[in-house]
Amino acid sequence: MDDTIIALATAVGEGSIHVLRLSGPQAQEIIERAFTPHHPQRWQEKSNFTLHLGYFRAGAKVLDEVLIGRMSAPGSYTGEDVYEINCHGGLYIAERIMRECIGLGARLAEAGEFTKRAFLNGKLDLIQAEAIVDLIAAKTDSSADLALAQMEGLLSQKILLLKDQVMETLAFIEAGIDFPEDDVESLDRDALLQRISKGLELARDLLDGSKTGRILREGMLTVIVGQPNVGKSSLLNALMGEERAIVTDIPGTTRDEIRESVTIGGILLQLVDTAGLRESEDLVEKLGIERSWKAMEKAELILLIIQAGQELKAEELKILSQYDQSVIVLINKMDLLAGKERGEEVLENYPTQQGVWIPFSVKENLGFKQLEKEIKQRVYQGKAEKTKEPLLSNIRQITALERAVSALANGWDSVKNGLPWDMVSIDIRQALQEISQMTGDSVQESLLDDIFSRFCIGK
């Protein structure tokens, strides 16, 4: 990292201002050559984290009046000397300033290169770096809060505890291998089992929250299914707050999947409205119904809509039988019933009680609060939704931790079965390697390139 990089940190296009970020060993020299401050004495003080107004020049020609932020190494975002040039928001002006900096020795930054330098300079670990991308992409308060907790290092702290435990376990084993004649604790297999069990407990605790974390980060794939004309499209429109799907009394109106995103109780749902389930001779409708069944196979949540006062159809019973734990049954059109039937007593009409059943009416706005409560219950797995407990949410990190758990479990089995300690150490070392991959302490350059390529150019 002996070169200096520059990139536009704001979105391409016209606006009130553009921000150019410059970082590297030549950053100060480039700015000194191109920037004429309005207050030279204050500029010469070289105070850190300060803003300075002045002219940015290309030789004798003034390009713009700019505001420059100075952040000196090692206290900057990248750990290098960083200057942020705030210019007027025309893209032409920003490009002129960028070209001048490149002419003075900088080069255009690659995608994510500023954050990659921050990682390589020890300003943040890989989990914190990936959380920055998640924060930028966040679509709900919950996903933003999750990313912020990871950026603050709260998740990294828990992983560091796990890593320390596994490192101590490995040292414990290696002491037993190196000094087999000593009557020390390292020869005690029960003590070793306890150490491995502690590591497994810490790792599994992290994994337990990963489903919640992943849903908060990516959303929950939710499929709306049911017979024709039970209110599937009406529910989609109600959740969206707009007429997204066509609603008619004609069966088979929805023939293809309609996909939309909606936030309920701070949780992002990736909604799929499907074709009504029935026997049909229409080729196009039959294809839509086949897609409905395939969508259910991938769904994390199935909203099965049935019509109040009607017996369950074969397709509905099949869904309840096959996808019991994933189903919430919405007994829709409660507004069409009279008397006691409009209350909880309606549940008595359905002897099959797989899944969760909610009396519902899109027309009268009945059942939406209970639906939101049930969705939260499933996502947070009964825990308080406002918890600040850091959660795993990144599939790369989750996969690495799953491999670490597998390696620790293999090590535990090896000890229990009386295998030599050098054999046990192979599994424990593998677990340590996987945990180090999570934080970036031990990671291949190709993986780093892949991770940081997902960032925008100016980040």
From Swiss-Prot:
GO cellular component: cytosol
Pfam hit, one: MMR_HSR1
GO molecular function, one term: metal ion binding
Keyword vocabulary terms for this entry: Cytoplasm, GTP-binding, Hydrolase, Magnesium, Metal-binding, Nucleotide-binding, Potassium, tRNA processing
InterPro entries per UniProt: G_TrmE (IPR031168), GTP-bd (IPR006073), GTP-bd_TrmE_N (IPR018948), GTPase_MnmE (IPR004520), MnmE_dom2 (IPR027368), MnmE_helical (IPR025867), P-loop_NTPase (IPR027417), Small_GTP-bd (IPR005225)
Subcellular location: Cytoplasm
GO biological process: tRNA methylation; tRNA wobble uridine modification
Subunit structure comment from the entry: Homodimer. Heterotetramer of two MnmE and two MnmG subunits.
Described purpose of this protein according to its UniProt entry: Exhibits a very high intrinsic GTPase hydrolysis rate. Involved in the addition of a carboxymethylaminomethyl (cmnm) group at the wobble position (U34) of certain tRNAs, forming tRNA-cmnm(5)s(2)U34.
Protein name according to UniProt: tRNA modification GTPase MnmE
Name of the gene encoding the protein in the UniProt record: mnmE
